[in-house]
Amino acid sequence: MQQLTEIVEQALVIIDQASDLKALDDIRVDYLGKKGKITDMMKMMGSLSPEEKPAFGQAVNDAKQAIQQKLTERIDGLKSAELEAKLIAEKIDVTLPGRTIEIGGLHPVTRTIERIETFFGELGFSVKQGPEIEDDFHNFDALNISEHHPARADHDTFYFNPKLMLRTQTSGVQIRTMETEKPPLRIISPGRVYRNDYDQTHTPMFHQVEGLLVDEHVNFAELKGVLHDFLRNFFEEDLQVRFRPSYFPFTEPSAEVDVMGKNGKWLEVLGCGMVHPNVLRSVGIDPEKYSGFAFGMGVERLTMLRYGVNDLRAFFENDLRFLKQFK
């Protein structure tokens, strides 16, 4: 019995000293395996008297259970320590600032178009789109632009053939709308247009927004009121606005609209007028019953004025140093 007690005490000490799971498994085999020290003690049962066997057998089982319990406790302890060490190594310091994702911004031209659409949308105007490759009827004839008008010259227009071209304005969208829908009409038509020009204030492709309202008893005073409100909303200040008499083939009377700049000079911002009766007739609308007004504005020009940009070409150069200012 003394020998059994020493074996158990020795085993418990060795188990406490084990530093990993493999060492514990080796101890288990050494003491509880088929050739282990506790198993060898069971073989001594044959040399004992019948009276001694029960007590000895119980002592061996107790020793076996003590070693097994100690092994289990030590295994659990090592696994817990291993998990804790892993968690410490992988822990997240919640006091550190988060990793932010840099959010891009809308291009200034896109921002301007959205601003225009929002304002006129609140007035009941719907947004219409049309083809960028246009025929001469929708781009010129229906707009009261005669065959010999300077706008039809090769140096101003990109032609595919004499009857097909890149549109020079989005007015064709207005014509297509009036062909398919009956008055009353309130639309704006934003989009890309093309003209053969390139310098500090012109590019071969630029963006326009044109507007059209057709109904009974429409007058010039309503046009002035709408554009006054739009310009003050767009520039977010109570601007001084003037309407200068002008000429456009598709409107009569026609006007160009200026705003007073911070330098005390007038700046042209858009053109407008009452829809010419010939334009209404070309799409089957009776000019004796209906009247309307139209207006058109260059998006890049408005954007330049709003943000203080001096060179139109900056909008198309994709320079991040420039574009990041508008985030």
From Swiss-Prot:
GO terms for cellular component: cytoplasm. CDD domains: PheRS_alpha_core (cd00496). The keyword Magnesium applies. One of its GO terms (biological process) is phenylalanyl-tRNA aminoacylation. GO terms for molecular function: ATP binding; magnesium ion binding; phenylalanine-tRNA ligase activity; tRNA binding. Keywords: Aminoacyl-tRNA synthetase, ATP-binding, Cytoplasm, Ligase, Magnesium, Metal-binding, Nucleotide-binding, Protein biosynthesis. Its main location: cytoplasm. Its EC number is 6.1.1.20. It comes from the Bacteria. InterPro entries: aa-tRNA-synth_II, aa-tRNA-synth_II/BPL/LPL, Phe-tRNA-synth_IIc_asu, Phe-tRNA_ligase_II_N, Phe_tRNA_ligase_alpha1_bac, Phenylalanyl-tRNA_Synthase, tRNA-bd_arm. Mg(2+) binds at E252. Binds 2 magnesium ions per tetramer. The keyword Glycoprotein does not apply. It catalyses: tRNA(Phe) + L-phenylalanine + ATP = L-phenylalanyl-tRNA(Phe) + AMP + diphosphate + H(+). Its cofactor is Mg(2+). It is found in: Cytoplasm. Tetramer of two alpha and two beta subunits. Belongs to the class-II aminoacyl-tRNA synthetase family. Phe-tRNA synthetase alpha subunit type 1 subfamily. NCBIfam families: pheS (TIGR00468). This is Phenylalanine--tRNA ligase alpha subunit.
